């Protein structure tokens, strides 16, 4: 259930989930900011999109975002057999996600005349 042009790989970095049907909270702004944060953190990132003719699941974030509008992004790690008794994920991806989160919490997002900039807190 993925678009072959946006295939993701285990140990390939943080995965940004996007959906044209807005099943995920990711939009152009949140995706761009996430990519900026990944670059700042020295963490690779990948983009996942559902296959165009096969609707995928959704996340709680998309449901909550319909009630309270907050800029957000759906991120995670590439996995095999999600929600099964034996999920498989890359060990490097855990470290990447931790480094991304650390950078996120140490950074202030500043809106500028020409877009956004990231500054140390």
Predicted regions and their residues:
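Active-site-adjacent substrate-binding region
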Residues: 2-84, 112
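His/Asp/Glu-rich mid-to-C-terminal helical/loop segments that flank catalytic regions of hydrolases
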Residues: 77-121
